[in-house]
Structures are given as structure tokens and as C-alpha cells.
Amino acid sequence: MIRRLFIGIVASLACLTSWAQELELDSIQATDMMVELKELVVKGGLPNTRLKGNAMITRVEGTPLAQSGTLGEMLVKVPGMTGTEDSPEVLGKGAPLIYINGRLLRDDSELKRLRSEDIRDVEVINNPGAQYDATVRAVVRIRTKRQQGEGLSLDLTATTEQDLRYGFNRPSGKLGLNYRTGGVDVFGSVYYFHQDYRQYSWLEETTNTTKLFHQEGPYTMTWKNNLLTYTAGVNWQINDNHSVGVRADLTQFLGGTNMVIFDEDVFENNIRIDHLYSEQTSKETKPLGILTNAYYNGTAGKLGIDFNFDFLSTEINTARENVENSLVNDDFVLSGSGTESRLYATKLVLSYPVWKGMLEAGTEMTFARRHNTYWIDKPTIADTDADIKEDNIATFVEYGTDFGQWGKASVGLRYEHTLFDYKDDMNSDYLHRSMHEFFPTAAYSVRLGNVQTALSYSLKTNRPSFFAMNDAVTYISRYSMQSGNSQLLNERLHDLTLSASWQWLTLTASYGRCKHVITQWSFVSDDDAALIKHINLDRPVNTLGAYIAFTPRVGIWSLNATAGVEKQDLYLDLEDPHVQGGMRRAYFDKPVYTLNAFNTFSLKHDWRFDINFMLRSHGHQLNFYDDYDNMRLNLIVQKTFLKDKALTLRAAVLDALQRNHMNEYGDMGYYKIQQNNRYSTHKFQFTVIYRLNATRSKYKGTGAGKDAQQRMKN
């Protein structure tokens, strides 16, 4: 089925190419120097999007995207992207690495702190080359506006979000200062955020072994915390060939409490045997978190040099109380956990022109240390005191060349040596792995008439997060527990991506084959408790995706829309004692459809209205099925004031239809789970933005050790 679909997509691309070549349209002329590289600039609508190799570059400055709000709100509107403002994704590729002026975005709160007005353009790379970590399936590179001017500038933003259904409020604010003189740029900011988030769910679990065991009932999850983020840095542009800089992000956690409430009935062979009401309260403390980056960027003759050094230090301690009221017996359970993480990373990229192209080579080294502890006052669950050590040393080389009218091509190879040690002093568990892996990449792009096309291939991997490898059993309730798995294998993914762009239309199709897929599975204990832990599937997963983006503009109205489908080919043979032979085959192959439509109406006197609609249909993702069509409708109005447009007022109703839901069903043979989630996203949002003498930071650090940093956060 997937093969026939893929052949059909390729045939459609061929027809599009032929049709476009027959059209007698005037070629698009532009003053941008990049046109000289024979890239296709897509006009006829905003934002302007062009295909460059296997990357889509979207201009933000001077388009309706520039007034989207926060960086996160803008990214979900960029062609080739989807997701939410808190978790943007690249279509068909998942969460990307995000760079801002070459610096890795290491703190997700920057998605809220940075404004879309500051952005010049966004580059979406849907199949990154050998320079990037082998775990990276997509990269988003953001460039801010290059404004001239010196002196002091101020940037003040204040936002309040009022939940329209449950009544709570979530304020945030940022004060940023920038001072520029000559080639020196000094910047700093303070950001405050109050988190108040609710999730309301209905949970059903059925275990069908020698007896039928069933649990059902509502549960509520609440997260509340306050944090301050301090940012400071300096950039020195020595001359046109040399620049250096350093940046530090300090996060002060002001305390937080999470609460999970279960209220469920328990049945055995259709007879109620218990009613459990459980309150789990978690109080978190975190010392000051440190994220730093230092860089040098320059040239020595024809040799380009890009060097980065990163350091990360985080710690979190959690104390939990479980109060359980039951028909069988009441209980009070105490537990606690702690995590300390340290990371040192460095990356060096050298570039040199060779023949008609550019040769890039370099190295990246990451050294990660993590210490996990867990204790509980129940003798049936073991305590944990584990050390995790992971060292990754990589070298890479990539060469790209331009064949003129015959197109551009690049090939690359990345070698990674990974050393992993896991040791638990409480139970003598020890695991040692030493891996040597090669990851090839290749890309080819050519313009066929008025159509720009690109084809790319890469071999990728996905390493489990440090949380997923933690063997400690976390107590949720007497019927539910959770654990990691230090025996997990890395995923191996072959990725083939085809792109085509014509005027304001862009089509992307991709095929992926993944082995050792990591997912969650349930195991049943002798006392009928469910243990959820991570496993590797024993079958590969084939996935096909196709997306089309179109960005027309008519008068005051501009549209940025994306439609697509993603389908996986997966079946599993599941243990089920109630079928003949004790095994049954389950198919997980229902496609997921996506439709995003971002409408902008730009009126006189600096008024602007936005109607943003996002739809994700029901369908399978790995061994889980979402049977709900998720919809989000956001209505936004904003007005700019003062002669220099320094003041902006913005009001929005988020999730106006209250359809941001998810109903997830998991089939694991003898164990089935249905979880229906309702999120607290129906809100009224009001934002005030004031800027004085706006300038932009010239910081050019790219960051290193990106994969390990992300896995520590997960």
C-alpha cells in the first residue's frame, strides 16, 4: 500500500513539473543576492517562501507573519511546520532543533520570550546533513532582523492569560535591555512566568489474563510553578572576519506543586471490588539552573572557522505524598526522587572552497553525567541510586557543489563513537555499551522549468532519553506504576524526502523506515498492578507522509495553509489468552490527516485580525490510536500605536471551539487502555508590547551537544 502511494506522489510531482514548464509566465526578478544562485523565489503571496536544497526559507520581515505574536505562535504558521506554540514541529519529522542566529535554543521559554517582530526569516531543513547530530531529523534556523543603530534599547512585554472555563490566570512578562557601541554588543533580560495548567481526563484500563480486571474513572492533573530566567551576554565583532561572544542563561525556580487525583472504580470479572480515591502531591525544588555558551566565528584566508563550547548544569528534587482512600484499605505513601545533570560539549566546523563547491569538516564532543535517586517507603518497590555516564565523540565531513543548470549536490558522512555506562549502587545493576556508528547523507536539487525540486537521503538514530533509561519504579497508585528501561536499543531510521516548489505552492513527500522503535508497554504484576515502561518494538515501522503548503494573497487577506497526510505500516502479534492459539494480530495503520489554515486581514490604521484554524484527524501513532479529531480555533485582534509603532496591544480568544482534546487508545494484547484528555486551553489572552530605540543582538553562537541537552530535558 505504501509503495503504491509513494509511486502516485512521484507521478503527481512529474505532472506538476511538466505543467509548470508549459506555462508561459514571466520569470520572477528580485534584488536578493540569493537569486544569483538560481533559487526559486515564490511570489504571489505572503510569506515569501523559496526552496534552497532540502530547506524551505520563509521571509518573515515585512509579511503578516511578523505580527504573529511570540516566536512559538509564528513558527506553527511557517510553511512546513505544525504543532503548538509551546511545541512546534516540522511536518512528518517531529520536534526540530531550533537555532536563533546560529545559537541553539536550549530553553523552551524562549519560544514565549522572543517576538515575531524581531524575525527576519526562518529556514526549515527537513532532512539535515552530516554536520548535525545523527539523532536530528529536522532543523529550524531563525535569523533576526539586522537593524542598524547604536546606544541603549528597551523591550518590554507583559501578557495575561485568563482561563475561560476554569477561571485561573497565567501571567508572564519580560524586560530586555541592549547596549551597542562600535563592534561591542551587550545584552540582558529578565523573564517571569507563572505556570498554571490543568488536564482533565477519563481513564479506563482492562487486563484480560486468567481473570478480567478493569479500572475506570476520572483523574485530574495540575501543574503550578513560578520561574525567573536571567539572560546576559556580550558579542564583540572585532572586524568583518572575526567575532567572539559569551552568553549565560540562569533559571531560578521559585517553587512548584503538581497534583494528580484518581477517582476510580475497580472491577474483577465484572464485579466491583474497590473504589480508590488517590491524591498524589509532588513538591519540586530546583537550585539555580545554568546554561552557557561561548563561541568564535571567523575566517583565516579562505578557511571558515566556527567553534562553540557549551556547559549545562541542572538539578531537581521532588517529594511526593500519596493519600489513598479505598474500600479495601487506606494507605499513605511517601516517596522522593532527585536528578543531577551536567553536560560539557564542544563543536568545531571548518569550511574551505574546493573546486566548484564547499568542503565542510569538523568534530563534536559531548560528555554527559547524570545521577538519579529514588526512594519509597514500600518494601515491595526497590530504591535506586544510579549514575549514568554517556560520552559521544563525532567527526563529520560534507561536500556540496554546484553543477549550474544541472543542479546542486552534496554528500556527507558522520561517524559517532558513543560510550554508555549505567550503574545502580542499590541493586548492583551495571550496563556498559560501546558503539561505533556511521551515518551517510546525500542531497540533490535542480530547477525544472519553473519548479524547484530537491531529493535527500539520510540515516538517523534516536537514543532514548535519560528518563526512559532510568530503571527506578515510580509509584503512581496501588494499581499503577511507571519505570524506564536501561536495556533500550537506539532506533535506526532511513529517511528519503522529496520536495517541489512552484510559485506559492510547496509539496513535500517523505518515506521512513525505522527499526528498534521505542514506545511504551504495560506489564501486569502478580497483584494486578500495571507497570508502564519503555520497550523496543520487534518490528520495523514504515511511514509515508505527503504535505502541500500554499500561501496566496488577495487584497487585505493573506492565507498560509497546509494540508497533508501521514500513514504508518505497522502490525504486531499480541499475546491474548482469550483467542485461539493465545496470539492475535493487530494492525496500526490508520492515516492521520492535517489541515492548518492561518488567515490574516491587514486593515488601515495598523489594525490586524487573525483567524487561525488547525485540525489533526484521528489515526494511529505507533501502537496507539487517537479516535478524536482535534481542532483549535484562535481569534486575534491587534492594534499598533505611536508614530514609530512602538506600542502594540493584542487580544486573543484561544481554542474558541473548545475542541483541543485527545482520546488515546492503546492495545497491548492482554492489556488495553483508553485515556480521554481535555486540556485547559480555552483562554482570553491580552498582551502589551513596548519598544524603545529597538536594536537586535548580534550573538552568533551555534551551541554544541544539542541531542544530549534535549534528552536531559525529556
Please identify what each model-predicted range represents.
Residues T229-G255, E279-D424, S445-R447, Q452, ...:
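Face-selective signature of the C-terminal outer-membrane beta-barrel domain
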Residues T49, G72-L104:
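Extracytoplasmic beta-strand/coil segments of soluble accessory domains associated
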Residues T144-T160, Y200-E204, E216, L228-A232, ...:
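Surface-exposed extracellular loop regions of Gram-negative outer-membrane beta-barrel proteins
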Residues K77, R103-G129:
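Short acidic/polar hinge/loop motifs at secondary-structure boundaries
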Residues I388, Y430-M435, T461-K515, A530-G545, ...:
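Outer-membrane beta-barrel signature, preferentially recognizing the C-terminal barrel domain
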Residues I28, E39, L71-M74, S109, ...:
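N-terminal periplasmic accessory domains that precede
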Residues E22-P64, T84-E85, K93, I125-N126:
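Short, acidic, small-residue-rich periplasmic hinge/interaction motif at the N-terminus
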Residues L343-K347, A394, L489, T506-N596:
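Outer membrane beta-barrel strand-and-loop segments of large Gram-negative receptors
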